[in-house]
Design a protein with these regions (language model features):
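Residue-level detector of functional hotspots within protein domains
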Residues: 35, 84, 107, 146, ...
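Short beta-strand-centered segments that line the small-molecule binding cleft or hinge
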Residues: 132-135
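Bilobed periplasmic-binding protein-like "clamshell/Venus-flytrap" ligand-binding domains
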Residues: 47-75, 124-125, 170-207
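Sec-exported extracytoplasmic/periplasmic mature domains
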Residues: 41-50, 91-98, 115-119, 127, ...
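Short, solvent-exposed loop/beta-turn-alpha elements that line the ligand-binding surface or hinge
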Residues: 2-38, 53-66, 113-117, 137-169, ...
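Ligand/substrate-recognition segments at binding pockets and active sites
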Residues: 4-6, 19, 23-37, 47-128
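Generic hydrophobic/packing signal
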Residues: 36-37, 41, 87-91, 100, ...
C-alpha cells in the first residue's frame, strides 16, 4: 500500500469534486468537519442534486433514493468502532437535507444483507493475506453473485480488472505497488469504500520468562513472534 512518504501520497477523499484540497494545516477539527461537509455538497451537485438558498437539498436526480441506510454489526449495542463516525455523518448530512439512517443490527442480519447484495451501505473489518492480492474483493468476476460473490461493492470496471490481473502476475514488489496504486485510484473514484483505520498487532512478553532479544525484529501482522520460534529463548 502507498505510504505517507511516497510521492503523490494524500489522504483518501481529501479533495472536493473539482479536485481542490479540502483541508489545510491551519484548520482545527471543527473547521475540518465544516470543510468536509461543504466538499460533500460539491459531490452531491455533481451527481445532479440541487440545493436551495438555505443549503438544503431541493431536488434529487432521477432514480436517486430519498434516504440512505448504513448497516453496522454492533449487535444493537453500538459495539463497533465506526458507529460513532456513522452517527456523526448522519447528523452532519441532516443539516443539508440528506437522510442517512444508521441501523445497528446483529451479525446474522448484516451478513445476510451483505451476501444477498441488498445492503446499501455497510461497515466491516477484514485482513488481507501476506500477498496483498486485490482480486477477491475488487475484480468483477466476483461481483453480482458471481464467483466467490466477494466483490460486495459490485464494481464492474474493465480498466480495474486489467490492473488487478497485471499486478497479481508480477513478483516485483515495486512494480506491483505502482500498479495497485493505479487500481486504488480507480476504486476511490468509484466512491465505494471509505478507509477508516488499520489495526495494529501488539506482542507483550515477560522479560522474566523470555529473552526479548531473541524475538523477531520489526514484527508485522504477517511476521509475528511465532515466525522465528525456533530461535526464541526462554529463561
Amino acid at each position: 500500500a502507498p505510504q505517507p512518504a511516497d510521492e503523490g501520497y494524500r489522504a483518501a477523499y481529501s479533495v472536493d469534486a473539482d479536485g481542490n484540497d479540502i483541508f489545510d494545516s491551519s484548520m482545527n477539527d471543527e473547521q475540518k468537519y465544516d470543510a468536509a461537509l461543504k466538499a460533500a455538497v460539491t459531490f452531491f451537485e455533481k451527481a445532479g442534486y440541487t440545493f436551495d438558498a438555505d443549503g438544503k437539498v431541493a431536488s434529487a436526480p432521477a432514480g436517486a433514493p430519498e434516504s440512505y441506510e448504513i448497516l453496522i454489526p454492533g449487535q444493537g449495542k453500538q459495539d463497533h468502532p465506526t458507529y460513532g463516525i456513522a452517527t456523526a455523518a448522519s447528523k452532519a448530512l441532516e443539516t443539508i437535507g440528506i437522510k442517512l439512517s444508521v441501523n445497528d443490527v446483529g451479525t446474522s442480519v448484516w451478513n445476510n444483507a451483505l451476501e444477498g447484495n441488498t445492503a446499501q451501505m455497510w461497515v466491516a473489518a477484514w485482513q488481507s493475506t501476506a500477498d496483498p492480492d486485490m482480486y477477491q474483493v475488487y475484480h468483477s468476476s466476483n461481483a453480482h453473485g458471481k464467483g466467490t460473490n466477494s466483490n460486495h461493492y459490485q464494481v464492474d470496471d474493465p480498466a480495474l480488472d486489467a490492473l488487478i490481473i497485471d499486478g497479481r502476475t508480477s513478483a516485483d514488489t515495486e512494480y506491483r505497488k505502482s500498479v495497485y496504486k493505479q487500481a486504488m485510484e480507480i476504486i476511490m473514484d468509484w466512491g465505494v469504500e471509505l478507509p477508516v483505520y488499520q489495526r495494529k498487532d501488539c506482542t507483550v512478553a515477560s522479560t522474566i520468562r523470555v529473552d526479548c532479544d531473541t524475538l523477531p525484529k520489526d514484527m508485522t501482522p504477517y511476521w509475528g513472534w511465532k515466525a522465528e520460534i525456533e530461535t526464541l529463548a526462554v529463561k
